[in-house]
Amino acid sequence: MTASETQNADLFWGLRGGGGNFGIVTSFEYRLHPVGQVLGGPVLYPFSAAKDAFEFYRDFSQAAPDELFCEFGVGPAPDGQRAVFLFMCYTGPPDLGEKTIAPVREFGRPLQDMLQPMTYCEVQRAFDADFPFGLKNY
């Protein structure tokens, strides 16, 4: 049986949002789209700025375009001190990338700004050391 937006649509939507016990899927078909260079990476802030950084993240991410993924997190800075970070991946037109992330670069006093052009695969591998194979995080 095939389920899609147009064929067996009720089953398709049930599988999409029905949780882990709705049925057994034996194969998937994906439509892939090429992704060139993206603008990605983290900007780290001192942990003492966590409240302000989270409020900034809340406001910034709500107004961000669909081409920008933005995540807030807590973790160690390269020197070992506790920090908060905004991790971003901008996949839109390259000429608009810097303009889109400018508010992040202008916010607060970053400990480190590692936002840079990279491949989408590099963005996907950014947290590999923190989530090793076998933990089933995806």
Label each PLM-derived region with a short phrase.
Residues 1-138:
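Soluble FAD-dependent oxygen oxidases
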